[in-house]
Structure formats: C-alpha cells, structure tokens
Regions:
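Bacterial N-terminal signal peptides that target proteins for export
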Residues: 1-10
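Lipid interaction determinants
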Residues: 24-78, 89-133
C-alpha cells in the first residue's frame, strides 16, 4: 500500500510539472514577428553565390523578401510570399517555383529570430535572422 501511495505521489508531481511548463503560443510568436524585417540566410542562391534574405512580415499574412547577393550586397530581386505560424512553426510560401520554407521551433530572443530551417520537409540547418531597425 505504501508503494502505491509513493507512485501515486510521484505521478501527481509529474502531472503538475508538465501542467506548469508551457510553450509560447502561436499568437505570441505572430505578434513578435509581424511588422518587422528579419535579415539572414534562408538558403537561396548557390554555394559560390549565396543570397541574403531580408523578409518583411506584414499583418495580412503576406510578406516581401528583399534579396541581395551576399558577397557584394547588390540587389538580387524581391520575392513576395505568404506566411503563417502553426504549432510553433513559421511557414514561408514563395509559390510553386520555390521550396516551402519552414522554421520549426521558431522563437524571438532579443533581436534574433531563431529556429530550424526545413525546405520541403527536409532539415537544412539551425538559423538566426537579425531584426533590422
């Protein structure tokens, strides 16, 4: 009987522990991302000619990616995209000509957007994008 009470107590403590831990919900993430421009590598371009992205996320679920060549800073073009956050993942949909980009476990820490980048469901790398003023 003592053994049952002991295990019941441990189970109760674990239940409370899980109940009090929380993840940032999608609305909080959405608010942190919206209306800002985030600059970094979203895996456009080629190894010998990489492109840096500056993504602006507007509150209507649309955005624009101001792309520049990483080596010389010359404009590479602007790409419109749709974006949304679902279950802690930021989705960037540039249309059929480009892979769907997912930033899983997305979080904003200070001036940095951080997470794991996936292209069409395949893990690429951990990334950090810096917020621009």
């Amino acid at each position: 009987m003592k053994m049952v009470k002991r295990y019941a107590g441990i189970l109760m403590m674990l239940t409370l522990l899980v109940g009090f831990t929380s993840c940032e919900d999608d609305e909080d993430i959405y608010d942190d991302l919206m209306g800002r421009t985030w600059v970094g590598d979203l895996w456009f371009g080629y190894d010998d000619n990489p492109i840096e992205s500056g993504i602006r996320l507007d509150n209507n679920g649309l955005g624009i990616d101001y792309q520049v060549y990483d080596y010389n800073g010359r404009p590479a073009g602007d790409l419109p995209f749709r974006w949304w956050v679902d279950y802690g993942t930021l989705y960037l949909d540039y249309g059929r000509d480009f892979e769907l980009r997912e930033i899983r476990g997305v979080r904003v820490r200070g001036r940095y957007l951080q997470g794991d980048l996936y292209l069409d469901g395949e893990y690429i790398d951990y990334i950090e994008l810096q917020m621009q003023q």
